[in-house]
């Protein structure tokens, strides 16, 4: 049986950020990833947005780690040459009934320490983005976008430079608490048993499934997994926007927004579809809903200009808005198993928060 100090399950942005932090502190780390490449699930199927920290309950892990992680991510991307752009964001109210809610989000942003945010008039909004239609808006200059794949590769490179080992196509079939550590049954082309002293469950959509297969962990400590599918539609033709354009948040999502990747491709999404099983297909019929929603803030959207693009699935623990839910970082204080950290509900703003979240995990292991 092979032995190591630390096993990290999952090679998305969260798992890789944690593995990097542990390896750079001299820990012996093995990263187990069930897929045949890094970051193929939640990490690859999102908007690639660096969030400011507006949508989260003051004092929550999401709020604290998003704001701290945002600054760390910008600094890291600049230092390491990861393509990114601080393009800014407009959060728009499209009718008078939404203005009170916009005011509330402004107040929450200030409580969370978001700097530079300001209320703008419809005229000011149109000076920033001539195609936008709104009755009021918030301008958030600190928001941006990042090349997620480059970020993933850089995290992995740092971890491997500190002697971490990545094993792809290595699903963890089950595990058990064993003395002062853990024993894992790992599948794949060369099945093996692997013992470790510290175990980080950063499996994303698979976190609850693995936790239930870990003998010695009380299953009552495992929260439910709620799947929130979000589809994206891309725009055929040139984007009219320089910034991110966000409507007000809705249940389960920060809104069906307009974003643009670093290559200039505009897309809209995600919407929210509560599902019972993993399904990444995008229903072309949803374009009707998308067109209706987008035209509230971009009336000049051309007919039939939206094409199905891709879908992502957010690993929630409840049917709740971003403001009403939070990350879950379970340690022995919650589940009474020393050396085990379970990460649940790491949805948006997980990408933005990833470096700060890794530091949080390090602190809880100390």
Q: Language model features by range: what are they?
A:
Residues 48-124, 134, 255-256:
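Dinucleotide-binding Rossmann-like beta1-alpha1 core, especially the glycine-rich loop
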Residues 4-31:
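N-terminal Rossmann-like FAD-binding beta1-loop-alpha1 element of flavoenzymes
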Residues 138-198, 355, 364:
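Helical element adjacent to the flavin cofactor pocket in flavoenzyme catalytic cores
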Residues 3, 25, 44, 324-366:
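C-terminal lid/capping helical subdomain adjacent to the catalytic/cofactor pocket in oxidative enzymes
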Residues 21, 50, 82-85, 193-198, ...:
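Active-site substrate-recognition segment that forms the wall
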Residues 58-68, 92-101, 139-157, 281-286, ...:
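Short beta-strand to alpha-helix junction loop
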Residues 23-45:
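Glycine-rich FAD pyrophosphate-binding loop
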Residues 56, 83-93, 116, 122-162, ...:
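Helix-loop-beta segment of a Rossmann-like dinucleotide-binding subdomain
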């Amino acid at each position: 049986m092979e032995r190591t100090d630390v096993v990290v399950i999952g090679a998305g942005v969260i798992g890789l950020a944690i593995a990097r932090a542990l390896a750079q502190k001299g820990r012996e780390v093995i990263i187990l990833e069930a897929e045949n490449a890094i970051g193929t699930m939640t990490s690859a199927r999102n908007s690639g947005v660096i969030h400011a920290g507006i949508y989260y309950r003051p004092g929550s892990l999401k709020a604290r780690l998003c704001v701290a992680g945002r600054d760390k991510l910008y600094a890291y991307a600049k230092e390491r040459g990861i393509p990114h752009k601080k393009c800014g964001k407009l959060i728009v109210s499209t009718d008078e009934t939404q203005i009170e809610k916009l005011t509330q989000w402004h107040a929450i942003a200030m409580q969370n320490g978001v700097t530079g945010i300001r209320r703008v008039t419809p005229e000011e909004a149109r000076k920033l983005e001539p195609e936008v239609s709104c009755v009021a808006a918030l301008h958030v200059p600190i928001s941006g976008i990042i090349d997620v794949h480059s970020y993933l590769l850089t995290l992995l490179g740092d971890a491997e430079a500190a002697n971490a080992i990545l094993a792809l196509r290595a699903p963890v079939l089950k595990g058990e608490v064993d003395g002062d550590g853990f024993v894992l049954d790992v599948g794949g082309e060369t099945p093996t048993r692997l013992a470790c002293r510290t175990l980080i469950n950063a499996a994303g959509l698979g976190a609850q499934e693995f936790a239930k297969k870990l003998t010695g962990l009380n299953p009552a400590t495992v929260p439910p997994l709620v799947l929130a599918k979000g589809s994206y539609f891309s725009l055929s033709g040139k984007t009219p926007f320089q910034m991110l354009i966000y409507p007000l948040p809705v249940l389960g999502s920060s809104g069906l927004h307009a974003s643009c990747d670093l290559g200039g491709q505009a897309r809209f999404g995600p919407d929210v579809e509560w599902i019972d099983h993993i399904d990444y297909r995008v229903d072309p019929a949803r374009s009707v809903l998308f067109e209706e929603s987008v035209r509230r803030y971009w009336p000049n959207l051309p007919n039939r200009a939206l094409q199905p693009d891709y879908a992502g699935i957010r690993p929630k623990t409840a049917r709740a808005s971003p403001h009403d839910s939070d990350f879950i970082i379970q340690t022995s204080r919650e589940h009474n198993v020393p050396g085990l950290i379970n990460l649940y509900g790491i949805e948006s703003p997980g990408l933005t928060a990833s470096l700060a979240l890794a530091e949080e995990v390090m602190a809880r292991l100390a």
